[in-house]
A protein has these predicted regions:
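N-terminal pre-domain/capping segments
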Residues: 1-100, 123-145
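Active-site-proximal beta-alpha loop/turn segments in soluble metabolic enzymes
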Residues: 110-126, 146
Length: 146
């Protein structure tokens, strides 16, 4: 059996496209390769190079494959879901050029502020919010399949 293991920039503490406290993308990719990972997901849009030739070159230098792109947002919000769908379309232009990138990682937003810890969304969903959450996931899924 041949198993390949992948990782993501968030394993290196990367949550934002740009933040001076985060590991620089070059170091992140180097350490992923040095750790023996075979595949990576793109992480937050704009953190790794998002131009095909540049990303392809950086992946090949490190013998890594792109396996997925990532969407993060408030899945209980119709407005945020529409923004995620627009971002999915933008990312698809890049993703579809990599045969190995067959997945989209979908992550709901945190319910606390990542810098202050302040509660910014309900910690628990009520029935209506849960229904909206599922509806919006299915909406993104259906759009991705189209």
């Amino acid at each position: 059996m041949n198993i390949k293991v992948g990782t993501a920039p968030d394993s290196w503490g990367v949550w934002f496209p740009e933040n001076e406290k985060q590991t620089p993308w070059e170091r992140c990719m180097n350490e992923m390769a040095e750790s023996g990972y075979a595949g990576i997901e793109l992480g937050p849009w704009g953190y790794l190079p998002n131009e095909y030739d540049s990303l392809k070159e950086e992946l090949e230098k490190r013998n890594l494959e792109l396996t997925a792109t990532t969407l993060v947002g408030d899945l209980t919000s119709d407005r945020k879901t529409e923004e995620l769908i627009a971002l999915l379309d933008e990312m698809a232009v890049l993703q579809l050029r990599f045969d190995s990138a067959k997945y989209v990682v979908l992550i709901d937003d945190c319910y606390t502020d990542l810098f202050t810890g302040e509660l910014v969304r309900p910690q628990f969903l009520n029935d209506a919010e849960w229904d909206k959450f599922i509806t919006n996931i299915l909406k993104i899924r259906d759009h991705a399949k189209a």
